[in-house]
C-alpha cells in the first residue's frame, strides 16, 4: 500500500530527486529510473534537492516514488490536487491514469469534482464519517441532494446544463458536446 499525505512535502526525505525515487525501491534500474523521471517531467532535476522544486514537481516526485514500487497495488492519496495549477493537474491526471492502467487501485480524497469525474470509476460520498452515496461519477455528481448531504458544491456545469435545458453535465467538455 502506498500512501501520500495531503502535505506531500513532509514525505520528501532525501537530498536529490534521484535518491527520493530510489530510496524505497532499491531494485529499480537506471533505465527504469530515467523513464520514470521523464514521465514525471523532472528528468532535468534528478540531482536537485526535492524541496527546491515547484509544488507541482514535488507532488509528482512523491507520487512517482509511490508508483515506482511494484508492490504498491493500492494507492491512498489525500487531497493530491491541493495547491496545483492547471498544468500540474493535467500531469497528475496522466500519472493517475497511468497507474490505473498498470493495475493499481487508487483511492483518493478530493473536493475536485471535475477531476474525480474524469478519473474515478466509483465515487464514495462521506458525511459525518458515514457513506451517504456510492455510485458512478455522473450518477453521484448530477444528484444535488447527494452533493448537499456530502457538503460538496454543486458543479457549475450542472447548473448551466439545467439552465440550457440539456442533459445533466458535470464538465465543460460535456456541455460543449451539447452546445456545439
Regions found by a protein language model. Give the residues of each.
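A short, surface-exposed alpha-helical micro-motif characterized by mixed small hydrophobic
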Residues: 116-118
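ABC ATPase nucleotide-binding domains
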Residues: 147-180
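Conserved ABC ATPase signature
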Residues: 49-53
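Helix N-cap at the start of a conserved alpha-helix in ABC-type nucleotide-binding domains
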Residues: 86-88
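H-loop/switch region of ABC-family ATPase nucleotide-binding domains
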Residues: 110-111
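Catalytic Walker B motif of ABC-type/P-loop ATPase nucleotide-binding domains
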Residues: 75-78
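Conserved beta-strand-loop-alpha-helix hinge in the C-terminal portion
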Residues: 130-157
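Conserved ABC ATPase "signature" region
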Residues: 30-45, 67
